[in-house]
A protein has these predicted regions:
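Active-site entrance/lid segments in N-terminal catalytic domains of soluble metabolic enzymes
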Residues: 1-174
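Conserved small/polar residues in nucleotide/adenosyl-binding loops
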Residues: 198-203
Length: 203
């Protein structure tokens, strides 16, 4: 049992209130298994894999490296070549993944389908209004990404120290503080903001 028991650790069955978010080209089985074995919530990045079949194979490979919980990130982006999101979603469900992190465009249809199959959903948000919508859609938690986050920080340029308490004041679901956290001091800062989770990004 970890030092901190939180709604996040209890909801997602992990030892520590730390999540490794989806990272394109990096979120592979080796990294996810290392995070899971250390007691955090790990995620494989679905679109790092060139096809839904390759994702299913990567999930199987990760299970060879850990017997602890891990999830899959499914980022919904506009692309010139359509992505077969329904097929990726089906691969996630059919392989028995129990946690999904969605990000990007409107995740409504995906959230509904995941929840219909008993999959817990975390949605990554860069604004309080997006987080409130995700909560209305039925997510189990939201990741609040401040401007410090890597990847897709949104368009508002609001840092986490401002965005996180604003979100905490309005949301009922667990919040993962994301962006710029890389050590124990960051975790304590997340706790001081009134929430008990953080996404660890960085070295």
């Amino acid at each position: 049992m970890g030092v901190f028991r939180t709604r996040f650790t209890e909801t997602f069955g992990v030892e520590h209130p730390i999540m490794q978010g989806g990272m394109q080209w990096v979120g592979r089985a080796e990294m996810a298994a290392a995070v899971a074995n250390a007691g955090g919530l790990a995620t494989l990045s679905a679109l790092t894999q060139p096809s839904p079949e390759a994702l299913a194979a990567e999930i199987a490979r990760c299970r060879e490296l850990t017997d602890r919980p891990f999830g899959v990130n499914l980022t919904l982006l506009p692309t010139q070549k359509p992505v077969p999101y329904a097929e990726y979603r089906a691969a996630i469900i059919e392989t028995g993944i129990r946690v999904v992190e969605t990000a990007g465009n409107d995740p409504g249809e995906h959230i509904a389908e995941f929840r219909r199959h008993g999959v817990k959903v975390i949605h990554k948000c860069t604004a309080v209004r997006h987080a409130l919508k995700a909560e209305r859609l039925g997510v189990d938690a939201v990741s609040i990404d401040g401007f410090e986050c890597a990847g897709h920080p949104g368009e508002d340029d609001i840092p986490g120290l401002v965005l996180l308490p604003a979100a905490a004041n309005r949301l009922r679901v667990p919040i993962i503080a994301s962006g710029g956290f890389a050590d124990g001091r960051g975790l304590v800062a997340a706790l001081a903001l009134g929430r008990s989770e953080e996404r660890r990004v960085g070295k």
